[in-house]
A protein has these predicted regions:
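Generic detection of intrinsically disordered/low-complexity segments and helix-coil linkers/edges
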Residues: 1-4, 106
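Charge-rich, low-complexity N-terminal segments
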Residues: 3-71
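Short, flexible coil/linker segments at or flanking structured domains
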Residues: 14-16, 64, 71-73, 93, ...
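Long, charge-dense
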Residues: 17, 24-35, 105-128, 132-139, ...
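Generic alpha-helical propensity signal that fires on short helical segments
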Residues: 41-46, 118, 167, 175-177
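Short, surface-exposed linear patches
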Residues: 49, 107-109, 180
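A surface-exposed, charged beta-strand/loop segment in the N-terminal or early-internal portion
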Residues: 63-117
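C-terminal charged interaction modules
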Residues: 123-180
């Protein structure tokens, strides 16, 4: 009985901890980008919905850093070949800004875009087994993009693999627009 009570307590604590370490809002700053197509806007909405529905995102702060308790709001933009991640608390007070160079992920962003285009074209004209082969390649590149993001955020943000994959999707969307 005591074991069960301890287990329930730990589950509640874990759930509360998880609620504090998640993204609850995302804004993609596209003010300096071309107007996105209807398809791009739809992809963004789906990617944001997926990210917000389930994520683990825990910025790493020094101890007793003010206003650092989540959940978090995340603004993503590209400025001067840098990915800019502005992390705010629920009250929308900026608590951390992370700048990452696009250079280390530029190739995988382009590769992912190319294979996505191949996949969309394949759906219209290829057999299911051919489509499945392309989709497996797309998923592998997407996974690699997620792993690269986890490494790039090392010592800045702890996140799970699914969160990194979903962020990679959003970064791809705004990066491709910025490179047009």
């Amino acid at each position: 009985m005591l074991f069960q009570q301890v287990y329930v307590f730990l589950q509640k604590m874990n759930n509360r901890d998880h609620e504090n370490h998640k993204i609850i809002a995302v804004d993609l700053d596209d003010s300096n980008l071309p107007i996105p197509s209807h398809e791009i806007l739809q992809e963004r909405k789906v990617a944001i919905f997926d990210l917000l529905s389930e994520n683990f995102f825990k910025p790493i702060f020094p101890k007793n850093y003010p206003n650092s308790i989540g959940p978090y709001r995340l603004d993503i933009s590209i400025k001067d070949q840098l990915l800019v991640f502005k992390i705010s608390n629920v009250e929308n007070h900026l608590i951390r800004e992370i700048l990452l160079s696009i250079s280390p992920i530029r190739k995988i962003l382009k590769d992912y875009n190319e294979i996505c285009l191949s996949y969309y074209n394949a759906v219209k004209r290829l057999t299911p087994s051919q489509i499945e082969t392309i989709d497996m390649g797309r998923k592998a590149i997407h996974d690699e993009g997620g792993r690269i993001l986890i490494n790039r955020f090392n010592r800045k943000v702890d996140m799970d693999f699914q969160t990194s994959r979903r962020l990679f999707t959003l970064i791809t969307a705004i990066y491709l627009e910025s490179s047009k």
